[in-house]
């Protein structure tokens, strides 16, 4: 993966593959549902991870609420995005942005 241009969807795909390889099918299913929702939010356009911002995350949260997702679903999907984001930071694909998830519901 190109470190400078990795998309959220590519990173999700990598993490989902790792989860499946580890036999964590339920968790992989939740991550797949989260990336599907995020892709619908972006109208199936790739989202470079470097473009994640508090505004984008808040819009995603609002998108989910407008689709009548429960608060539990919203929180779960935001948590999966946060988890994938932190894995990308740990792998040095992107730089850490302090308080990126501060203004969204993440449980």
Where are these regions (language model features)?
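N-terminal core-binding DNA-recognition domain of tyrosine recombinases/integrases
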Residues: 13-26, 35-107
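Glycine-rich, histidine-containing beta strand-loop boundary motifs that form or position
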Residues: 32
């Amino acid at each position: 993966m190109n470190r400078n241009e990795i998309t959220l969807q590519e990173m999700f795909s990598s993490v989902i593959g790792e989860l499946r390889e580890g036999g964590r099918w339920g968790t992989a299913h939740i991550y797949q549902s989260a990336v599907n929702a995020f892709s619908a939010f972006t109208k199936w356009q790739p989202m470079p991870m470097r473009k994640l911002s508090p505004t984008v995350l808040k819009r995603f949260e609002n998108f989910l609420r407008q689709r009548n997702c429960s608060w539990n679903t919203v929180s779960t999907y935001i948590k999966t995005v946060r988890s994938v984001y932190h894995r990308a930071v740990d792998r040095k694909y992107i730089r850490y942005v302090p308080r990126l998830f501060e203004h969204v519901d993440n449980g």
